[in-house]
């Protein structure tokens, strides 16, 4: 251990009882200190960084915060109750004269730990042999680089290098006894255990977003895979080569490759899963127009017509809380002028940053610029359990508007990288393409149910927000927006035409009728309009201000409104019913609404650029439970663990999972889940069968897979046994319970079924010079193919063939007729 860490286990000493401050690891009492708050110890001087936990007798006003900032301190964030985390550089800070601190402490090692790390009760996945894998959040990128350098050669800690969008985070495998010594480093702000292991597949995102639920694998199910929908994706230079992009790149306007970011994002949007089925994207039927960023934005006016681009994906930042810039104005203008278009952006990875919104670190740090627009979608980053990632940027927008709009899986997303490989990346860069792909499937759904017509981009955005699964505080909030995207609910809203479109001018009021059916558990009504672009120097972005209320029998309900005041308490508070004068979206929800007629009143309160077109979308959430993965027809592996997903109305009764292998004649217990859960792990039965079913039960409610699952192992060790000039032999290991094997070969876009054989070998007649890919799946006892193995590429080099030279017969002069032996025994 280098000198910098010596002696850092000693915590600051307290001299009297003082104020309580709450951290993840526990509650700490701060007291008055004898020494000056600006006094740096030797370690802080060497690190050129010092953190202070400072308590006051009240929440500071902006002016009072400014006094501490003038004294050289950065207010990193608020700590309950009435305390702040301050950061300074030794020798450049002093104590502010007013307001004076009631008490203070150095940020101790224990204060920096999660509760699990503090208690030493870490999950198994954190343990790597005799070490724990943890993530250190440093003060800035420079501090992170120095921290890595100081760990070089350490016997108790080793840096784990992975590709990440978070340069301030250092991943380390550390001996548990040394954890607190490292945490006490003056530049370390926070330490957490490594993330829970993700399923090694983009299928996690498909299940989270419910795109799997509208791309069913059973006869008669939905098949909205984005076919024919064009996505404009701008990123870090050329992508590929990758077999998952086969037949999917409509046009490529990129420069030379600069890395794997673009490959990964493209695969998340529409990868075919040709090599590894687990890497299938959200819209595998869609087409891609690819650019070096920001070509997908600068060229959209031309390519909206030339290539029929309908959705764009941009996982790039454009400043932090940059305000309503010229870029923002252009994005809003794009959507207004190209009515069938929608821009999708990552919200950003600055969740802990202070981007000068005015509430300190952790708020108002959307990384744009362009993603501050009113008419676009900015996406937050969730993990596989629907928890917001610490790095995910928060709202509000610069003027207090709701940001982000929605959230999606962005943590440990498995997708394509160059040279036919895959990797797991984390960031809103990954949540954004999951949402863009989901939108492509919804455009497909609209075309399929509306005689081939495209929906307005604003309508799709409204449907996505109103059908999202509410997370965080009830109603919209500045972390999750309107919640996690739910493609199944959105597709049903499209199929059932649960929307109305109208327009009005200044001072006009429209009255729209709505009948709520019986047994509705929740009613959601959302009004949205594509607002004209504002002047770039305008103090408030909203131009046309519509107001909306829901009315029944003289009683009325106003939309949910957030408080954008620049303090932590306001920004953390749940939405309240009020008049909204900031946003171009307003939503009313009612729990357990009475059945019968309601009226939707939309008023053009201030419409300087009218008339204004608007969309009303509505959702009747029944009292129900519904499996969303698996839905039927999926392949599972005996003895494996599957992450099961379902949707359900709110309730207090827990869920029970059951499985059957006899057509539902009897059911076996598979596990339970709490009432608030919407996912659970299932240990798949070990006996192979083509007739496995799953159901979920809550009280008298239940739902089961719409068709049997295919429970059989994936063939292993697929290889090219030999390759001759005119044929290639494939072989693989046998699979227990398999009645046959289906062999797949790469087609124009996807892996197509070639033939089915009984033995674990196949000789394919084809020229050796023809490059292609093969895969194989085991067939169950009732003739249903299970999951494909990872595909292998057949090259063009002869191997294992008795023929020593690559020669061909041009003509036969003698004998005129007869039989010729094969070149293989």
Regions found by a protein language model. Name each.
Residues 18-224, 228-230:
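Autoinhibitory N-terminal propeptides
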């Amino acid at each position: 251990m280098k000198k910098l860490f010596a002696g850092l286990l000693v915590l600051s000493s307290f001299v009297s009882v003082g104020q309580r401050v709450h951290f993840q690891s526990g509650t700490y009492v701060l007291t008055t200190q004898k020494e000056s708050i600006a006094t740096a110890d030797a370690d802080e001087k060497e690190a050129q960084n010092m953190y202070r936990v400072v308590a006051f007798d009240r929440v500071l006003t902006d002016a009072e915060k400014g006094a501490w900032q003038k004294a050289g301190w950065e207010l990193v964030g608020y700590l309950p109750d009435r305390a702040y985390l301050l950061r300074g550089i030794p020798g450049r800070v002093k104590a502010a004269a007013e307001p004076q601190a009631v008490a203070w402490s150095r940020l101790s090692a224990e204060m920096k730990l999660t509760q699990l790390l503090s208690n030493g009760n870490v999950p198994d996945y954190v343990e790597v042999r005799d070490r724990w894998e943890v993530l250190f959040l440093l003060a800035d990128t420079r501090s992170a680089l120095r921290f890595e350098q100081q760990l070089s050669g350490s016997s108790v800690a080793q840096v784990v290098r992975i590709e990440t969008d978070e340069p301030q985070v250092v991943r380390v495998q550390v001996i548990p006894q040394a954890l607190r010594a490292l945490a006490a480093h003056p530049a370390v702000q926070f330490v957490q255990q490594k993330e829970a292991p993700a399923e090694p597949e983009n299928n996690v995102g498909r299940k989270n977003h419910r795109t799997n639920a509208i791309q069913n694998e059973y006869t008669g199910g939905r098949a909205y895979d984005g076919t024919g929908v064009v996505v404009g994706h701008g990123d870090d230079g050329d992508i590929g080569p990758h077999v998952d992009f086969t037949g999917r790149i409509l046009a490529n306007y990129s420069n030379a490759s600069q890395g794997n970011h673009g490959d990964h994002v493209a695969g998340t949007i529409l990868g075919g899963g040709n090599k590894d089925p687990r890497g299938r994207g959200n819209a595998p039927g869609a087409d891609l127009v690819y650019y070096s960023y920001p070509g997908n934005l600068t060229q959209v006016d031309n390519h909206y017509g030339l290539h029929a681009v309908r959705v764009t994906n941009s996982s790039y930042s454009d400043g932090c809380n940059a305000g309503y810039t010229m870029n923002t104005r252009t994005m809003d203008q794009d959507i207004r002028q190209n009515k069938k278009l929608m821009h999708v952006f990552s919200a950003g990875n600055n969740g802990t940053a202070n981007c000068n919104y005015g509430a300190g670190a952790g708020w108002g740090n959307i990384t744009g610029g362009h993603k501050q627009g009113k008419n676009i979608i900015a996406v937050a980053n969730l993990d596989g359990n629907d928890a917001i990632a610490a790095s995910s940027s928060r709202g509000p927008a610069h003027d207090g508007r709701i940001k982000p709009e929605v959230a999606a899986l962005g943590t440990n997303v498995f997708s394509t990288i160059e040279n036919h490989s895959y990797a797991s990346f984390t960031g809103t860069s990954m949540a954004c393409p999951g949402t863009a792909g989901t939108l492509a499937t919804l455009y497909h759904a609209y075309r399929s149910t509306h005689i081939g017509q495209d929906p307005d981009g604003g309508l799709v955005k409204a449907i996505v927000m109103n059908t999202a699964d509410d997370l965080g505080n009830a109603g919209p909030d500045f972390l999750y927006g309107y919640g996690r995207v739910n493609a199944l609910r959105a597709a049903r809203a499209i199929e059932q035409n649960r929307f109305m479109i109208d327009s009005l001018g200044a001072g006009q009021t429209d009255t729209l009728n709505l009948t709520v059916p019986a047994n509705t558990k929740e009613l959601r009504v959302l009004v949205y309009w594509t607002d004209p672009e504002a002047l770039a120097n305008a103090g408030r972005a909203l131009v046309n201000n519509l107001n909306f209320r829901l009315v029944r029998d003289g009683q009325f309900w106003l939309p949910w409104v957030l408080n954008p005041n620049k303090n932590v308490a306001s920004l953390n508070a749940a939405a309240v019913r009020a008049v909204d004068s900031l946003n171009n979206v307003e939503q009313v929800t009612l729990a357990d609404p009475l059945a019968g007629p309601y009226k939707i009143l939309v008023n053009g309160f201030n419409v300087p650029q009218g008339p204004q077109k608007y969309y009303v979308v509505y959702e009747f959430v029944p009292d129900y439970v519904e499996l969303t993965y698996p839905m039927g027809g999926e392949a599972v592996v005996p003895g494996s663990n599957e992450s099961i997903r379902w949707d359900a109305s709110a309730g207090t009764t827990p869920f029970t999972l059951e499985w059957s292998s006899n057509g539902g004649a009897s059911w076996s217990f598979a596990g339970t889940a709490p009432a608030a859960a919407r996912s659970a792990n299932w240990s798949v039965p070990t006996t192979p069968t083509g007739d496995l079913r799953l159901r979920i039960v809550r009280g008298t409610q239940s739902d089961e897979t719409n068709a049997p699952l295919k429970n059989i192992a994936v063939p292993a060790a697929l290889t090219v046994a030999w390759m001759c000039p005119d044929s290639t032999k494939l072989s693989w290991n046998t699979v227990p319970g398999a009645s046959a094997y289906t062999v797949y070969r790469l087609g124009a876009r996807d892996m197509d079924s070639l033939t089915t054989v009984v033995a674990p070998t196949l000789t394919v007649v084809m020229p050796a010079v023809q490059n292609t890919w093969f895969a194989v799946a085991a067939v169950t006892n009732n003739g249903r193919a299970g999951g494909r193995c990872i595909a292998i590429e057949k090259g063009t080099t002869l191997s294992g063939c008795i023929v020593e030279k690559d020669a061909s017969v041009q003509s036969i002069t003698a004998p005129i007729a007869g039989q010729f032996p094969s070149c293989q025994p």
